[in-house]
Curated annotation (Swiss-Prot):
Assembly description: Homotrimer. The membrane-bound form, but not the cytosolic one, assembles into large complexes. Interacts with the minor capsid proteins M1249L and p17; these interactions form a rigid zipper structure that stabilizes the capsomers.
Protein's name in the database: Hexon protein p72
Induction (UniProt): Expressed in the late phase of the viral replicative cycle.
Membrane-topology annotation of the record: Peripheral membrane protein
Coiled-coil positions: none
Subcellular location, record wording: Virion; Host endoplasmic reticulum membrane; Host cytoplasm, Host cytosol
Source organism: African swine fever virus (isolate Tick/Malawi/Lil 20-1/1983)
Role: Capsid protein that self-assembles to form the pseudo-hexameric capsomers of the icosahedral capsid. The capsid is constructed of 2760 pseudo-hexameric capsomers and 12 pentameric capsomers, with a T=277 symmetry, about 200 nm in diameter. The capsid encapsulates the DNA-containing nucleoid, the core shell and the inner membrane. Plays an essential role in virion assembly. Involved in virus attachment to the host cell.
Main location: virion
Recorded family membership: Belongs to the NCLDV major capsid protein family.
């Protein structure tokens, strides 16, 4: 084995290095500590690392402290009161178990669901469909309105997958069913924490969605989606595909690297041929080059490469199906003691039977929706051109009856902490006073054109930051066919529908001058649809006592830059362009120590105003403001109260 050579660490003594490293100070301290230790007669005069770290950082020295023994486990609790059905309230009592309680997660299983059987319509009939839209099964020879003659039009019925259905058949089809996006978030309409009949904190489903948009890190989003019932896409790939490599360094030539470096005819520089040959070797796609001389080689004027296409698909609760299997949901609670173990509540400080979690559940219609199970197929041939035919589809969407969805396994998992009796007694005997952060929410309706201003009367106490969004009323309207997709989005959602029409041409010209005129086209039954969220706030302002804190800032500054700059890893920039953040703290959500606030209990003239081109008397919206408010929790005499109530 070879021995290692001598290693020499060279320390620069420039002006910047003297400030950053302070090598003279380090040497002086080591010498002084040695002299002091020798004067005390210590057998080992060398300084300790802790003494060195008083003035210098030692990156390779780890530290630890002994810690108070602690253990924890989750305890399942059933509802204390309330019928476990959708649309009702459930109240969970927090039992006297363990020394502290911290994390909480609700567990529910939504039963299987499906829509009812329906009769296939008779040709020529019309019926009022879902969302107030008239559904028509036209007669042959007429257009979609069943009134305008259209020669060559023939109509049949098919299911969403193109399989034929006989008109007039009893119990011939049924609609597909699917869940709303993030059903676990929407299931909890309101969550409240009460002690001795006093509400200490509460939040709505809007708060939960804003927390997800701003605070769930990307590397945990897949797990979060699994918990709240949101489908996760699966990646698929194609087989190997041959593609051409174009280097545009030399204009108008697809393979400039074939030019010899000594070619005097070239008019501009080009990529070195050895460089591209290393990245796209010919033997990766040419069998003859690889050693099979009996196979005809592939020849091309450009370099070639072999690649695959990547596509995504999903089959979760949001994918329409004839039968949706039972759906298990795990919903984390968002109170201050759930988020930070340092703020776990001493269980012994509040008597059993006086602390409750109350949850208002959403109704079934908010969670599950139908998708058309029947389509009208128009097949039209062009008179005089029997080889030319166009095929189009329109949905026949009549609401069915979805079975009542059961709600089982209703449990609240409570994380209980256990400590030694000595520590337990300290918390029993002493009054505890701690800084906490609670939710303050205000939802205000608006229908003013172009500009509006709202007093934030529901906000109080010191506010560190606010999540803000203007949600169109249409997003949660029963008349919106996509409300189960749009309900959590803070902007107007439009659909970009891809219409890939498949063409087939049959050439029958008998002269070179004649162009083929027999071309058929077939549209997809369910074209690919991309939802696009359009932000509806142009500029936003915040004022307090007439003083502009934010004066007509563009919405993108609050939706993209503020969450990008502030919050460290605790805040992320949301995908929703209509979700905005305004912070009065330098480090929102980063640490327990407050770093800035505005006390709106003192600054009561606290307004938010905005400019918009969307909102009007018909296109109304709701301003949603979720604020993080500082308060103080006082635990004494078997009760928990907030220091400030107004």
């Amino acid at each position: 084995m070879a021995s290692g050579g001598a290693f020499c660490l060279i320390a620069n003594d420039g002006k910047a290095d003297k400030i950053i490293l302070a090598q003279d100070l380090l040497n002086s301290r080591i010498s002084n500590i040695k002299n002091v230790n020798k004067s005390y007669g210590k057998p080992d005069p060398e300084p300790t690392l802790s003494q060195i770290e008083e003035t210098h950082m030692v990156h390779f020295n780890a530290h630890f402290k002994p810690y108070v023994p602690i253990g924890f486990e989750y305890n399942k609790v059933r509802p204390h009161t309330g019928t476990p059905t959708l649309g009702n309230k459930l109240t969970f009592g927090i039992p006297q178990y363990g020394d502290f309680f911290h994390d909480m997660v609700g567990h529910h299983v939504l039963g299987a669901c499906h829509s009812s059987w329906q009769d296939a319509p008779i040709q020529g009939s019309s019926q009022m469909g879902a969302h107030g839209q008239l559904q028509t099964f036209p007669r042959n020879g007429y257009d979609w309105d069943n009134q305008t003659p259209l020669e060559g039009a023939v109509y049949t019925l098919v299911d969403p997958f193109g399989r034929p259905i006989v008109p007039g058949t009893k119990n011939a089809y049924r609609n597909l069913v699917y869940y709303c996006e993030y059903p676990g978030e929407r299931l909890y309409e309101n969550v409240r924490f009460d002690v001795n009949g006093n509400s200490l904190d509460e939040y709505s489903s809007d708060v939960t969605t804003l927390v997800r948009k701003f605070c769930i890190p990307g590397d945990k989003m897949t797990g979060y989606k699994h918990l709240v019932g949101q489908e996760v896409s699966v990646e698929g790939t194609s087989g190997p595909l041959l593609c051409n490599i174009h280097d545009l360094h030399k204009p108008h030539q697809s393979k400039p690297i074939l030019t010899d470096e000594n070619d005097t005819q070239r008019t501009c520089t080009h990529t070195n041929p050895k460089f591209l040959s290393q990245h796209f070797p010919e033997n990766s796609h040419n069998i003859q080059t690889a050693g099979k001389q009996d196979i005809t080689p592939i020849t091309d004027t450009t370099y070639l490469d072999i690649r695959r296409n990547v596509q995504y698909s999903c089959n979760g609760p949001q994918t329409p199906k004839y039968y949706q299997p039972p759906l298990a949901l795990w919903i984390k609670l968002r109170f201050w003691f759930n988020e930070n173990v340092n703020l776990a509540i001493p269980s012994v400080s509040i008597p059993f039977g006086e602390r409750f979690i109350t949850i208002k559940l959403a109704s079934q219609k908010d969670l599950v929706n139908e998708f058309p199970g029947l389509f009208v197929r128009q097949s039209r041939f062009i008179p005089g051109r029997p080889s030319r035919r166009n095929i189009r589809f329109k949905p026949w969407f009549i609401p069915g009856v979805i079975n009542e969805i059961s709600l089982t396994n209703n449990e609240l998992y409570i994380n209980n902490l256990f400590v030694t009796p000595e520590i337990h007694n300290l918390f029993v005997k002493r009054v505890r006073f701690s800084l906490i952060r609670v939710h303050k929410t205000q939802v205000t309706h608006t229908n003013n054109n172009h500009h509006d201003e709202k007093l934030m009367s529901a906000l109080k106490w010191p506010i560190e930051y606010m999540f803000i969004g203007l949600k169109p009323t249409w997003n949660i309207s029963d008349q919106n066919p996509h409300q189960h997709r749009d309900w959590h989005k803070f902007g107007h959602v439009v659909n970009a529908i891809m219409q890939p029409t498949h063409h087939a041409e049959i050439s029958f010209q008998d002269r070179d001058t004649a162009l083929p005129d027999a071309c058929s086209s077939i549209s997809d039954i369910n074209p690919v649809t991309y939802p696009i969220t359009l932000p509806i706030i142009k500029n936003i302002s915040v004022t307090a006592h007439g003083i502009n804190l934010i004066d007509k800032f563009p919405s993108k500054f609050c939706s993209s830059y503020i969450p990008f700059h502030y919050g460290g890893n605790s805040i992320k920039t949301p995908d929703d362009p209509g979700a905005m953040m305004i912070t009065f703290a330098l480090k929102p959500r980063e640490e327990y120590q407050p770093s800035g606030h505005i006390n709106v209990s003192r600054a009561r003239e606290f307004y938010i105003s905005w400019d918009t081109d969307y909102v009007g008397s018909i296109t109304t919206a709701d301003l949603v403001v979720s604020a993080s408010a500082i308060n103080f929790l006082l635990l004494q005499n078997g009760s928990a109260v907030l220091r400030y109530s107004t």
